[in-house]
Amino acid sequence: MDEGNYDAVILAAAGLKRLGLQERIQSYISTCDSIPAAGQGVMAIETRIGDDETMEIIQFIHDEKVASCIMAERAFLEKVGGDCKVPAGIYAVPFLGHIEAVAFIGSPDGKEMYKRSLNGQTQDAERLGESLAEALIADGGGRILEELRK
């Protein structure tokens, strides 16, 4: 990094902080400017089926509001057929008892982008994600997704 053999570099602030290099952080990219992939920044723990003891130990880290947001994000991703090759993202956050979500579908070359935001109740998280996907598909994102599948 110090040799300067690049025009620009974007690194995770969390990683730089862990390395004790926080003084090198020049700026942060907001989620308004760069919508992350679904589930970014959320920790998930998988346990054995029926392992009640482990479930009891880890229950304190479960946050129902965050879980609802992830449900919305996963529903969006499933509806658009998202994987690591699909230029789509969604960011859902809990806010005053409901979920605020923003999502996009873009072309691989970055020339086209469809972006929408939507609010919904936490109990309707999956429907919120699906609705965002349906709206973006109708806006023109569906054509991009079809091209990617060819």
For the regions a language model picked out, list residue spans one by one.
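Small-molecule-sensing regulatory modules
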Residues: 2-150
